[in-house]
Amino acid sequence: MTIFLQDLSFELPGGAAALKASKPLRTTLDARIIRAEDGTVRLQAKVRAISADHLDVFIAEVTYAGLFEADVADDDAAQRMVPFVMAELGVLTQKSGLGALRLPWPWLPRAAPLP
């Protein structure tokens, strides 16, 4: 089974990226708030895609860039955004099916296999 992350930003600036698989996937969503040493607050949403019949497991980590990078942002604001972001990711997952998770700009995707 091949799971790959296709970034369309070069072909379609502001377009979507997609996590696609040749067979259906089971996906789980998780989010966490990260406070950097410089005081920047960042919300990171993690999508884990697991094949139902293969051992190939990949994690796509997406970080919403710029949303919590201002001095006015704080942990409380980030906490209030978590349910909204998770709901959006859930809707995107359901709309596109378990085999394709679409991530709208400005989500910045990275994919890496788990050991």
Name these PLM-found stretches.
Residues 1-115:
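N-terminal intrinsically disordered, cationic/polar leader segments
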